[in-house]
C-alpha cells in the first residue's frame, strides 16, 4: 500500500504593493522639449517645378519661383497646410 503524500505548504509571496512601497505608480512624462511647426508639401513631382498644379505661368525669365513651385506658405494662394510635431 502506498504511503499518503505529504501536503506541501504554499510559499508566501509578497504582494505587488510592496514593490511600489505602497505609493501610486507614476505616469510617465514624455521626453520632449516642445513642438515645432513644419509645412506639409504635396508630392506633385514634375508639376511642382512647372507651376502647372496651380495654373501659374513661369516668370519673365522662363523659370518658376519657389513660391510658385511650392506654394505661398499658407498665406492665401495655395494654402500650404502645416503640422505640429514633437521635438525629441
Curated annotation (Swiss-Prot):
<protein>
    <recommendedName>
        <fullName>Uncharacterized protein 342R</fullName>
    </recommendedName>
</protein>
<comment type="similarity">
    <text>Belongs to the IIV-6 342R family.</text>
</comment>
